[in-house]
Swiss-Prot record:
Family: Belongs to the 'GDSL' lipolytic enzyme family.
Organism: Arabidopsis thaliana (Mouse-ear cress)
A cellular-component GO term for this protein: extracellular region
InterPro entries per the UniProt record, alphabetical: GDSL (IPR001087), GLIP1-5/GLL25 (IPR044552), Lipase_GDSL_AS (IPR008265), SGNH_hydro_sf (IPR036514), SGNH_plant_lipase-like (IPR035669)
Signal peptide: 1-21
A Pfam family of this chain: Lipase_GDSL
SUPFAM superfamilies: SGNH hydrolase
Lineage: Eukaryota, Viridiplantae, Streptophyta, Embryophyta, Tracheophyta
Protein origin, superkingdom: Eukaryota
Gene: GLIP4
GO biological-process terms attached to the record: lipid catabolic process
Transit peptide listed as a keyword: no
Protein name: GDSL esterase/lipase 4
Gene3D superfamilies per the UniProt record, alphabetical: SGNH hydrolase (3.40.50.1110)
Length: 377
């Protein structure tokens, strides 16, 4: 027969167990209530599958093998072999995977965790890569309008006060503009015959700023931005000039460098002008350039050659028979050895490294806040 002391110990342990369970449940509920959402806007760097729901031409889709082969084991629409930086940032923020906003079937509760509006080939302008989808727009203005619809749904489902809390606490992450600078050369347009490079950059940044201000009017306060990467030095860009294989495409490089000089000035002006406006700006250009130019320092074997593609540096965009079965492609054995998965897009490993810098990078990499700090505000 058990002693009274033993019975007392059992009772105390039982009470402690119940108490810990209650605390655990309370903490989880508190996390759900106070967790900041993540809303993403942009282009193929953040694409999580929206293009699956467009009538897109095949060269702008990634819902076929070998995309997605590393982690998901099937193509999700992400333009990578696996996860992208949005996925990692969501993980660091204790959020579920953030779904593409066009994906059917997500629950209303998912809206309180965020949505991804980014789409391959999207630009600030509606006229950037206009033939990539049929009878639809996916530019930054359209992405803003899609968010406005979500905002209305949040107000309808949660009430005005709770919707305002979700919107003000959320983080809004952007990567946009690179396609606007690449498209004039891709399509051989007369853009720069009619306007100066500086004026064109003003248009790109000005339209981006308008969207930021519209989100601010809706209650958004915390923003994250990536500078534009060295897209004149991707495998696809390195083979544009057949007489200089391996050389960066200078016209795009020049525009991106000018953009990256001007955009931080605009953000500082917004910070001074808009009460409560806080932001993180990650120097994506430097982070990616370092990995292209010195891959072994970051655990890669190849910085300029793509894992999947054809031709010199696998820089021709035929990955997964993208342009039909008549155009074959080569696929590397281990994507983790490569910075680029296809001629223009990063591997999961590269995405993860960049995501870590956006999340918790020091002030010389991500400033004036990093995303970890923004999520805690």
């Amino acid at each position: 027969m058990a002693s009274p002391r033993f019975n007392s110990i059992i009772i105390i342990l039982f009470i402690c167990t119940i108490s810990l369970s209650i605390v655990s449940i309370s903490c989880k509920e508190d996390l759900k209530t106070n967790q900041a959402a993540l809303f993403a806007f942009g282009d193929s760097l953040f694409e999580a599958g929206n293009n699956n729901y467009f009538d897109s031409i095949s060269s702008f889709r990634s819902n076929f093998w070998p995309y997605g082969k590393t982690t998901f084991k099937f193509p999700t629409g992400r333009v990578s072999d696996g996860r992208i930086m949005i996925d990692f940032i969501a993980e660091y923020a204790w959020l579920p995977l953030i779904p593409p906003n066009l994906q059917p079937g997500y629950s209303n509760s998912q809206l309180t965790y965020g949505l991804n509006f980014a789409t391959t080939a999207a630009g600030v302008f509606a006229g950037t890569f206009p033939g990539s989808v049929t009878n639809l727009s996916k530019d930054l203005g359209t992405q803003l309008n899609n968010f406005k619809n979500v905002e209305k749904t949040l107000r309808s489902n949660l009430g005005d006060a709770e919707a305002r809390r979700v919107i003000s606490k959320a983080v809004y992450l952007f990567h946009i503009g690179a396609n606007d600078y690449q498209y004039p050369f891709f399509a051989n347009t007369s853009t720069f015959s009619n306007t100066t490079k500086e004026r064109f950059i003003d248009f790109v940044i000005g339209n981006t700023t308008t969207v930021i201000e519209e989100l601010y009017k809706l209650g958004a306060r915390k923003f994250g931005f990536l500078s534009l990467g060295p897209f004149g030095c991707t495998p696809s860009a390195l083979i544009i000039n057949s007489t200089k294989i391996g050389s960066c495409f200078e016209p795009v490089t020049e525009l991106i460098n000018l953009h990256n000089q001007e955009f931080p000035k605009v953000l500082r002006r917004l910070e001074r002008r808009l009460s409560g406006f806080k932001y993180a700006l990650h120097d994506f250009h430097t982070s990616l350039s370092q990995r292209i130019n010195n891959p072994s320092r970051y655990g890669f074997k190849e910085g300029e050659m793509a894992c999947c593609g054809s031709g010199p540096l696998r820089g021709i965009n035929t990955c997964g028979f993208r342009n039909g079965p008549s155009q074959g492609y080569k696929l590397c054995e281990n994507a983790d050895d490569y910075v680029f998965f296809d001629p223009s897009h990063l591997t999961e490993t590269a995405h993860q490294q960049i995501a870590e810098l956006i999340w918790s990078g020091p002030p010389n990499v991500t400033a004036p806040y990093n995303l970890k700090t923004l999520f805690r505000l």
